[in-house]
């Protein structure tokens, strides 16, 4: 709903032509190929999780004469490399450190009888070729500690 609202409110020149959901009946590849056949002028694809992004990257990589910008969600190894290679335009990264921290605070507050907010936003970050190798990512990319030498992954 948020994705559609953002397009509708702030990007009226962008047409949302297809929404596909991962299911057991049809592979991501098959859904994507059907959508691209129906909408051959597709300029971009937004993927809502790491597995879908990896499948889309693989499928689009096999297509000839297709210039499609792929935007992912999460930041697995395949996505990080795809951003560096220019195959993925960018990704919205979750903040695992912030998620863990917020969960610990919420658990402690609940255990001590305090109220816990109904909505907790642990943060996220846009990552693309311009900032993929910047060290100050505040724990957003998984395995950050190993990649950038940070302590405890933050």
Q: Where are these predicted regions, by residue range?
A:
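Flexible loop/hinge segments that line or gate small-molecule binding clefts
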Residues: 76-89, 130, 136
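Conserved beta-strand segments of alpha/beta enzyme cores
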Residues: 15-17, 69, 90, 125
């Amino acid at each position: 709903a948020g994705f559609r609202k953002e397009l509708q409110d702030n990007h009226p020149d962008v047409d949302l032509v297809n929404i596909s959901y991962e299911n057991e009946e049809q592979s991501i590849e098959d859904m994507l190929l059907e959508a691209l056949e129906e909408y051959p002028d597709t300029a971009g694809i937004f993927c809502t999780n790491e597995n879908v992004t990896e499948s889309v990257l693989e499928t689009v990589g096999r297509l000839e004469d297709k210039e499609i910008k792929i935007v992912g969600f999460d930041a697995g190894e395949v996505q990080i490399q795809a951003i560096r290679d220019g195959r993925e335009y960018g990704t919205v990264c979750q903040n695992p450190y912030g998620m863990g921290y917020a969960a610990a605070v919420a658990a402690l507050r609940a255990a001590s009888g305090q109220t816990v907010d109904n909505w907790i936003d642990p943060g996220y970050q846009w990552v693309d070729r311009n900032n993929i190798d910047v060290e100050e990512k505040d724990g957003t990319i998984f395995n950050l500690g190993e990649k950038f030498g940070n302590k405890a992954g933050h």
